Amino acid sequence: MKVNIDNKIKLHGFNNLTKTLSFNMYDICYAKSAEDREAYISYIDEQYNADRLTEILTNVTEIIGANILNIAKQDYDPQGASVTILVCENPIEEERKEALVKETPGPLPEIVLAHLDKSHITVHTYPEYHPDEGICTFRADIDVSTCGMISPLRALNYLVHSFEADIMTMDYRVRGFTRDITGRKLFIDHKINSIQNYIPSNIKTKYNMIDVNVYQENIFHTKCRLKQFDLDNYLFGYTKKDLYPKERKKITHKLKKEMDEIFYGKNFDEVYYK
């Protein structure tokens, strides 16, 4: 259903639709020794500590034009962090309303617009490593849940830029219903056919993307994987010049196998690569 400013839908009471964006990013690297793996985990833990994550979520809140009611943040031992922000709505300025219903990438934090009520933003981090293979991964799980007119997809552009991930999985769903003035139920209040429409072209050219959408259920799923692979970008503490060719090939295989398994959500046997 298309909503536009010139032909507004008249609602009965408040817009009761709940819109939720789940954004998961993965960073993958290879650390040669146990000490290197521990150093990577410590580096990631510091890079994405509770204070840094709070800064990112605060910028998300500004982008969608909300007021912060409460912030709860926590760093964990031995690693990981989480932040939860409760937010409430800001009034929408008339000249900004048109931007709220467009199926286009959202702004970066310099531009502030949106509308929220009874909503929350959360992030949790999950650093880990393989006990034997030298592979280390970091996952950040961000949920932006809103009630009202604006879609949390407006924050997606900024989140993509904030993490520059190797792999991303994004889920968007709309739940509940609101009513027009005749009492007719509305189960979605904006046009959408893909989450990809909210990702800028310069980002889309860098990733291979797959959509799995269930339109009749208002469920949209997109996963992305970097096209370009440069081994130097995945080595922690040294470069490929420090490795023998045979070792480079072995590490490249391990990294690509790890990325395949994360992207497709299943384990692959070695025979798959022969």
From Swiss-Prot:
Site feature: Cleavage (non-hydrolytic): K118, S119
EC annotation from Swiss-Prot or TrEMBL: 4.1.1.50
The keyword Magnesium is assigned to this record: no
Designated name of the protein: S-adenosylmethionine decarboxylase proenzyme
Stated family: Belongs to the prokaryotic AdoMetDC family. Type 2 subfamily.
Cofactor dependency: pyruvate
GO cellular component terms given for this protein: cytosol
UniProt superkingdom: Bacteria
Pyruvic acid (Ser) modified-residue sites: S119
Active site as annotated: S119 (schiff-base intermediate with substrate), H124 (proton acceptor), C147 (proton donor)
Pfam family, one: AdoMet_dc
Gene Ontology terms for molecular function: adenosylmethionine decarboxylase activity
Known partners and oligomeric status: Heterooctamer of four alpha and four beta chains arranged as a tetramer of alpha/beta heterodimers.
Biological process per Gene Ontology, one example term: spermidine biosynthetic process
PTMs per UniProt: Is synthesized initially as an inactive proenzyme. Formation of the active enzyme involves a self-maturation process in which the active site pyruvoyl group is generated from an internal serine residue via an autocatalytic post-translational modification. Two non-identical subunits are generated from the proenzyme in this reaction, and the pyruvate is formed at the N-terminus of the alpha chain, which is derived from the carboxyl end of the proenzyme.
Function of the protein: Catalyzes the decarboxylation of S-adenosylmethionine to S-adenosylmethioninamine (dcAdoMet), the propylamine donor required for the synthesis of the polyamines spermine and spermidine from the diamine putrescine.
Pathway assigned in UniProt: Amine and polyamine biosynthesis; S-adenosylmethioninamine biosynthesis; S-adenosylmethioninamine from S-adenosyl-L-methionine: step 1/1
Co-factor: note: Binds 1 pyruvoyl group covalently per subunit.
Key word S-adenosyl-L-methionine present: yes
Reaction catalysed by this enzyme: S-adenosyl-L-methionine + H(+) = S-adenosyl 3-(methylsulfanyl)propylamine + CO2
Keywords from the UniProt entry: Autocatalytic cleavage, Decarboxylase, Lyase, Polyamine biosynthesis, Pyruvate, S-adenosyl-L-methionine, Schiff base, Spermidine biosynthesis, Zymogen
